[in-house]
A protein has these predicted regions:
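Acidic/polar, glycine-enriched structural segments that form the non-catalytic walls/loops
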Residues: 1-137, 155-168
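Well-ordered alpha-helical segments within folded domains of soluble proteins
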Residues: 141-151
């Protein structure tokens, strides 16, 4: 493995495990470095299968709380890009509606946890480094909309980071 200021290169390998520990000093200006080093050290002490298993269990503890079955459709077997194109012509795809519902839950689950910051205006789904409005927190409808699904999709605790942010 070779690392430079702008790249990481892996050659002649069948696999590579790259561990990254990222965070913010939004709440703790002095302790973020130790916090990140602790999490990286914990991750380094585990093999990939353990890390994956622990991540999957944590994710599924939230995601598996809800299932939504709106019925089977003729397009259930299609790749998503074909389904979306077909949906533009004919809205009769109950499975796509259920998939979209679960995608919204996935975005919220993936963007926050108790004790962390809530998703910002762009969340983690922005496709650029320089986000519109700098990905700021504005306590208006835009930030609130990120949290609308929390209660109705059985992810109540995921709106708590927003409450904590507004308290501070």
């Amino acid at each position: 493995m070779t690392a430079t200021d702008s790249s990481l290169s892996v050659r002649s390998a069948s696999e590579a495990i790259i561990l990254v520990s990222l965070g913010t000093d939004y709440f703790d200006k002095d302790g973020v470095g130790q916090f990140l080093e602790k999490y990286l050290s914990q991750a380094e002490s585990k093999d990939f299968s353990t890390l994956r298993r622990e991540h999957t269990l944590a994710y599924r503890s939230l995601f598996d709380r809800v299932s939504l079955d709106l019925g089977k459709g003729e397009r259930d077997h299609l790749p998503i890009h074909e389904r979306l194109a077909a949906f533009a012509q004919d809205k009769n795809d109950p499975g796509l509606a259920a998939l979209y519902f679960q995608f919204g839950r996935y975005l919220l689950i993936s963007s926050t946890r108790q004790g962390l910051l809530p998703p910002n205006l762009q969340g983690l789904w922005c496709n650029t480094i320089h986000t519109p409005w700098n990905g700021d927190y504005h306590l208006n409808i835009n930030l609130q909309m990120n949290h609308w699904p929390a209660e109705v999709t059985n992810l109540s605790e995921l709106h708590l980071p927003l409450i904590e942010l507004t308290k501070q």
